[in-house]
Amino acid sequence: MKKHAKVYYSENLVEQVNEFETSFEIKPLERGLGNTLGNALRRTVLSSIPSCAVFGVKIEGIKHEFTVLDDVIEDVVTILNNLKRVRFFYNPSVFSQNSIHVASFLGQKAGQIYARDIESHSGLKIVNPDLYIADVSKVGALKFELFITNGKGFVDFETNKKYVNEVISLLESQIEGSVLAVDSDFSPVLNANYQAVEINSASPIIEEKLNFSIKTDGSIFAKDALSQGAKILIAHLNLLADVENLNKFSADFFGDQEIKEEPIRRFSNSIDALDLSVRSLNALRRAQYYKISDIEKLSQDDFENIKNLGRKSVQEIMEKLQNYKNENKGEN
């Protein structure tokens, strides 16, 4: 009987941009399995990873999207398009008791309004706080509420319009106006690609490795997205593995995967947290330095001996490393 080689999985840290955009390597695989696994994983992570998104927006005094707002530069359609792009960190436990949550901006400031000015009533965290919403010339001229739910994939505004009509009596609000449905893009994965490469073409037994790259919107780590995609595939395949007992399997296979509440803390020891220039970051990675703990004991001479690090880059690293230490003195 043919023996199968042990398969290894690793993250390609040299090509890592940050923990939300990176690539992975899986090898050795039997010939043909690279494309089989890669295609299945790619389709799954792009379409089936659960998340949350805005499905409805209420703007004070607005009954339809073609109404004009005084003292606001943008029209209602533009504001709606901006608001539906606000992304929240998804925690399934938050939505287990209540499937609809509210976030709002109640006109407490004038000037340029960003996603960071929006307050979540349920403690949901906004992962793109620098997203521009609108420019307001008068305090109180713009007030709005976002209604958020969980789901998968893409839901168009026509479908959400029906959903709004179904749940309208459940939507608690502090302002007057109509709830306007918007498109909902629940997928936290922005991009996923794969490549199957032969790794021993000189051998009579041809094997492959799978290179899989993935980029998320910041609401989930790339590694977690890949893990969830694999678990979803395994759950479906497990149903087929025991054909004698298909009707005995529980639907729990397809429940939401629990996500850690504080993803940014896992980011804290990565050199990405120093916010270095691309040149400095790449030079450190090529020298096999990936964590702050790896470089904090290096001297200036040690840094200058690292290939492709000039004086300005060394100075930048040392200054930002010192700033990082000062900011995190009390967190040990």
From Swiss-Prot:
Region (Alpha N-terminal domain (alpha-NTD)): 1-244
Keyword Transferase attached: yes
EC number: 2.7.7.6
Keywords of this entry: DNA-directed RNA polymerase, Nucleotidyltransferase, Transcription, Transferase
Annotated stretches, region: Alpha C-terminal domain (alpha-CTD): 259-332
InterPro entries: DNA-dir_RNA_pol_insert, DNA-dir_RNA_pol_RpoA/D/Rpb3, DNA-dir_RpoA, RBP11-like, RNAP_asu_C, RNApol_insert_sf
GO cellular component: cytoplasm; DNA-directed RNA polymerase complex
Keyword Repressor: no
Catalytic activity: RNA(n) + a ribonucleoside 5'-triphosphate = RNA(n+1) + diphosphate
Protein name: DNA-directed RNA polymerase subunit alpha
Gene: rpoA
